[in-house]
């Protein structure tokens, strides 16, 4: 059973007074049946509404005619102030209208109209003799500004005033029936059988003369004039305040349609000025035959005219220039007389201009809501104008037409069934071309049509969705998905105009596509020619694979373009193009072959690029022709981009046909051909997508919920022993592994899919399945440390360049080098395996540096797997489109490198973080528990410390302190584990850890909060478990300084010569004791000297050595070996002067920088032997110990380089007086750079001595002195 999710809630929100209907939707078939019933119900109800509206308007009009009680204010009349000649005149107000008064009530007074600037208020503007009273300013002087308004504009002003913004006149009369008369020379002469003033009559005479001049000009003008730009603001040819488009008969086809078309379709020569009747009567209420036409030849008798009364269209756009020609709307057709429910159905097919109810079918104009009225702009593309239906077929009417580039062209009107009927465009903009692909109504239009559309992969449409730019939502509904059987002639005309625009868009798109195919073919011919030579770039087989079916596709579309281009150029509405689309659809089999080969072609192209630098250069620089308007005649494209073009093209084939069919009348000869082409295209896409309906369900996790991205990050994949950087995306139904393609200048990111696994097929491998899996190749620590040193050095160079204000080229070069080194470090450092297994038998291994991240990925995948129930497979097209979408969906936009950080981002903390892990609560049962600590360093997380295991408890109290070195760190993570001594207790995932992760959490290291160097307590919550911590931070500028000795007793902080003299020994006792204990039981301890010891144990040992406690050896035997190693490091760190002394430290730094190996060895050995005796012997003793530790590297993972990294700064770091650090610690970048330089030097000095095979002993004389003399 299909659950209509959200339907009831949405229904109640929309219709709170009614209960939602019950729908039994058990299958897709039930949904389709319910949809058909809904459509049928809407058609029936719309038919009934149209019929009732027909009857209502007829009765309203009949009642108005009988009572002669039209609202005068609605028709623009006010009680005018007495003119000098005493005549009563109609005048217009430009102010906001008030609601119509009730019957018998006097309307409120009116203000005098004010002159308004261009483009303000009513589009019609004030017109001499019509829109202004004679006494208004400058009303009599308008003759010098241009010809007076046309009669059509004069009459349409009444409607403008009705919808204007004026206040009713002070002494306006009650509404009454209006009848006006005009003479062919004198213009308006009577209103309700009362003569008008001489001034009105003279202005009317001027208007009639102007009409005749324009008619003669229009009959003889060239078609080319129609290409003039649409009127904006005040006309350059006429300053009378009337829309220039309406003044020019040729420029404005709407003027022709509204005013020059006879309702009876009889023969009528255009603009015959000498055959007018002396007087004509205008029936305002019912719009008699002469209405809306201006002075025309009347070949019918009065009785014939009365037989065909028409109800005019209503002008709903009070702020549009295009309303200037709009006719009169009687009160009966106003939306104000409809209830809200009636207005909801005012978008039906009946909403059109209609002839008399006794002769023609009734139509009503489209409705707009008041809010839409208020927002209608001068560019409104919905100019409603009254139109009669027929004209003589020999009277050519030229219309302005918008193409996709906004150029006005000319075209002939489509004659319907040979009757020469003119079909008015109710929506298409003639004054302003509608936007090509305008999105104003696009979403609404797509929603209306989605029921009829087949499933297409979600990709942007290449075909235009043409819709009027300023069209209101009520206009948009008329072109809805439910095609009414009563399609009006106006809709037919609109569709045919749209059809030309759609075809123009297809033609432009086809031209671009051909240029891309040409760019693909361009290198193919020379490559084929070179394949037969002794030095081929590619083999013939490789060329055939990469460019498979590209020549055939080019020929198919070249033939299609060559056939379509002349037909669009010689356009008429009778033009047929359906055969071209039908033939194109019949050749889609070539695309089938191309799509099937696409994945192989891409893989082959990538391999060839890697193997052949010449081909790689060619594939990245393919030139395709640009648009004519582009500055550069060609654009650079990669081979991968161009090979995807046909795949993208074929997925959009049905969208183009849908648009074309939507605007092709069913009676047009092209309609069946286009339908056949659409059917072929739909079947083709369905066959490619392999039973597309089940896949759509599998591609959604829940009903109505589409695939979404849950998590993504950069990870290292182990492929045949090699490390590869990948960007991994976790979607709601699959795991996708991609490779970030190399980017050339200015190009956007692109991804290449390596593999994917549906979540229903994914599992995590167990250790039993991994017996044959090889060990993970680990990178030696010294290599990683060397990379870190290089990175620090490059960062220092970048800062030096910035401070020196040198050119950006050097800085950019260094930044590029830094990015390469950081990327290499990120690639080489992870060593923790994260393996996923597919049901088809394939396994994939990722390397992660943090168990926290590994656990997070597992949790997210397992949580999502609970919602996935069905396996599926993606076609190459779907996979490519999904991969392309990753660019927009990704949340991690760049590799986590410090070079990618913004300048204003925090550089992180450098120094030492002391962490005390106190206790944890929230465990449900007693277990053996321990915690580990991770911090981020150089863009990735590493494990830094581990507590002891607290056995058999649900509330462990560790109270252990750790000192963690921070290198640009921003986050501290803690993970809590249950130690599993029974190996079979839990599955050994990844063949790595046998311990169970109980919880994980993290805390941000805020520099502001940690700067006071005081202990701060915090609680980290994780899965119901709470761990209590205390943290304290010592920044690098403080930790680098050695404090001078303030005491002469004890061991720590006392000069080494003083200690050895007091102890009468060559090497301090603390050094000998710690080394002996470590060599006894710590040589195979993983990470010895690198893993932090428990701080409390270290402090206890420190106190014992300081007071010369005789039980110190007993204490050491009971303590963790890492605490003993920590105590030894602490002793050397707290020496008031480094073991290599402040005096010789600069010399050691200079000696290690020598390039000549012989000179370096001589210098370094001489410096070493120049150290004070206690320092030298202690160092040699320690050096031998460290070399023995490194011999166990295979077990303890401590190489010579690792040991040098740990002890270098400890043994050589200068004291405060010799530190090269700046005195001002408020410069973190400078401090960090100085530290990096010193650390590099210190590590290299110690590493040099560790790597020397033998260090010569001091000479015998000195030896005897050193070992015999008591100090």
Curated annotation (Swiss-Prot):
Residues the record marks as site: Breakpoint for translocation to form BCR-ABL oncogene: 426-427
Effect of residue 1202 to A: Loss of GAP activity
Residues annotated as domain Rho-GAP: 1054-1248
Compositional bias of kind Low complexity: 87-105, 123-138, 346-356, 369-382
Signal peptide range: none
Modified sites of kind Phosphothreonine: 385, 641, 693
Chain intervals with Polar residues compositional bias: 199-208
Associated disorder: Leukemia, chronic myeloid: A clonal myeloproliferative disorder of a pluripotent stem cell with a specific cytogenetic abnormality, the Philadelphia chromosome (Ph), involving myeloid, erythroid, megakaryocytic, B-lymphoid, and sometimes T-lymphoid cells, but not marrow fibroblasts. A chromosomal aberration involving BCR has been found in patients with chronic myeloid leukemia. Translocation t(9;22)(q34;q11) with ABL1. The translocation produces a BCR-ABL found also in acute myeloid leukemia (AML) and acute lymphoblastic leukemia (ALL).
Name of this protein: Breakpoint cluster region protein
